[in-house]
Amino acid sequence: MNTSSQAVQQLQQAMTTTRQAASTIENLIAEHDYQDVAGLVTLAAAALLESAAYLMQGQDEAALESLEDADDLLDAVYDIIESDLGDGD
C-alpha cells in the first residue's frame, strides 16, 4: 500500500528532475529550434507537479497558485507557437 507521504516525496523528486531538465534546456551549448518553448513546457510541467504535491498535502490555495503559474507558462507556449505559425504565412 502507498501513502500520501510517498506520493508527495515522489512528486517532489519529479519536480527536482523536471527543473534540472529545464535548466539544461536553457543552457544548451548550441541553440535548438523551439528551445524556448521546450523550456516553458518543462517549467509548466514542474508547476503542475508542484500543484499535485500541494493538493496531496491539503494546501489548496498553493495548489491553485501553481496551476495558475502552469497556465501562464502554457499561454506563453501557445503565443510563441502561434506567432511562429503566423510568420510562415
Residue spans for each PLM region:
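Long, low-complexity or tandemly repetitive, helically biased scaffold regions used
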Residues: N2-D89
